[in-house]
Amino acid sequence: MQSERQKYIRNFSIVAHIDHGKSTLADRLIEATGTLTEREMDTQVLDNMDLEKERGITIKSQAVRLIYKRDTGEEYTLNLIDTPGHVDFNYEVSRSLAACEGAILVVDATQGIQAQTLANCYLALDNDLEIVPVINKIDLPSARPEEVKQEIEDVIGIEAEDAPLVSAKTGLNIKDALEAIVSKVPAPYGDEKAPLKALIFDSYYDSYKGVVCHIRVKEGTIREGTEIKLMNTGKVYEVVEVGVFVPNYMPVDELKAGDVGYVTASIKNVRDARVGDTITEAKRSANEALSGYRPAVPMVFSGIYPVDGAKYEELKEALEKLQVNDAALSFEPETSIALGFGFRCGFLGLLHMDIIQERLEREFNLDIITTAPSVIYKITKTDGTLIELTNPTNMPSPSEIKLMEEPIVKSSIITPSDYVGAVMDLAQNRRGIFKDMQYLDTTRVSLNYEIPLNEIIYDFFDALKSRTRGYASFDYELIGYKDADLVKLDILLNADVVDALSMIVPRERAYAKGRNMAQKLKEIIPRQMFEIPIQAAVGAKIIARETIKAMRKDVLAKCYGGDISRKRKLLEKQKEGKKRMRQVGSVEVPQEAFMAVLKTEE
């Protein structure tokens, strides 16, 4: 059932590979529809975190309402939902897409289709969205729009003959893109009188309003004073304000089926308004929630410790504040012998981890040490119990382990054909299993591998970029677990295990990794007054050793000539002292040592 009002609404999002000009296109659409005045326009209006502007990436989903007047005089309401393009934030993208009826697929006219173009495009197709291809950056001399159109038709299989050719930077042909949205994206359906059903596609904490939920109303009507219930948590709230974004808040009386807007209901914590949850009326609730909700599952874990132990409480507060805004971040307290008190934090992926670390340092002025990231291993013990291991320190002894499984990802790498050899070599070094390859055109190949997640969480992306001169693109998704022969590699300094440096590695690589780490630590740890043995061990077996020599004073300087026994006495005395020192001395491990562990030998 479609009302007259709904015929003039279009809900769409923009999907693209990183840096193909998604946020810039959003800026031009905002400008072309006169949503903001010239003075208010700022580059990348929708990326409002400093970090987003600096890295030039979109992290949180955003929404904005545009009013577009056609030449025929009809007025359309376009709700644009800007989504992140990075693979870590896939769940953010999928929920934003569920709030739309159509998606603009932005493809760079100079680069063509990249790995994430495909991944995001398939996500959009999974949500049954109408896909409108738009070819961007046609102002560049190296643009090849006709070839890219052909590529879109061949690789993705959607009609691209009349795709608008635009330049988001200069604002060329933006009107064509707006026309394409109005004519190709379907209008929303939904009964305005049915019980309320609204999808939360983003939520964040505002210090004045409490949690602000970005919602797409699928059925029914929501207005101020409505008693609402969140279907997955079952909590009931009263609506304080509903409104729309013009990117800033603009309160309205009500939101009806088909609308996109925000709602506040003095909710205190983002965890209570999970993204993907369904809002309904408390008194007249819908029978079932909207499908597709799944809580965000962290894939990568890392320990975060304050450099100064006294700042533990501050770190805890900072993490709690970030968590209010980021439902995907999880943390729990843990202690390390080497680093004291800290937290084991779970992240969606490496970029997410990087951003959280940077925000802790920037917004909260904290000095932190982070340990090597690790993934979740599943261990079946001999007595049949199953444990999920996120911290290598807690690994049970080998005699108790019956089976150990590690997460495997399906990855697709798109690379120029000249570099296929180098990429295959890299994937094999990382224990990748080759699945298939296909030529996208004469110069580019898509390779599909199954790779253990553990192998890509450190520096796979950097290694891939450096081997292909920055041309390859990469995308991955978790497909499941597979059993593996893994051991725990411990590092001992002065015969003490440094728990924060422990890591889980495949058995056949333990020796090489141990050697490598011992050598790296020897370069990084400063010399002390006594000699320090650095040992790498698997279980009770030492597999590699390096020694940091002691700094010593020349005790023979004052002996000129004279008897050898006198010199020997002084040397023996010095040796005794160093030995005593070694028994009581402790070794300070600098932050660089923890980082060095991550960089594997390429």
From Swiss-Prot:
It comes from the Bacteria. GTP binds at residues 19-24, 136-139. It is a peripheral membrane protein. Residues 7-189 form the tr-type G domain. One of its GO terms (biological process) is positive regulation of translation. It catalyses: GTP + H2O = GDP + phosphate + H(+). GO terms for cellular component: plasma membrane. It is an enzyme of class 3 (hydrolase). The keyword Acyltransferase does not apply. Signal peptide: none annotated. One of its GO terms (molecular function) is GTPase activity. Keywords: Cell membrane, GTP-binding, Hydrolase, Membrane, Nucleotide-binding, Protein biosynthesis. The keyword Membrane applies. It is found in: Cell membrane. Its EC number is 3.6.5.n1. Belongs to the TRAFAC class translation factor GTPase superfamily. Classic translation factor GTPase family. LepA subfamily. Required for accurate and efficient protein synthesis under certain stress conditions. May act as a fidelity factor of the translation reaction, by catalyzing a one-codon backward translocation of tRNAs on improperly translocated ribosomes. Back-translocation proceeds from a post-translocation (POST) complex to a pre-translocation (PRE) complex, thus giving elongation factor G a second chance to translocate the tRNAs correctly. Binds to ribosomes in a GTP-dependent manner. PANTHER family: TRANSLATION FACTOR GUF1 HOMOLOG, CHLOROPLASTIC, TRANSLATION FACTOR GUF1-RELATED. NCBIfam families: lepA (TIGR01393), small_GTP (TIGR00231). This is Elongation factor 4. The gene is lepA.
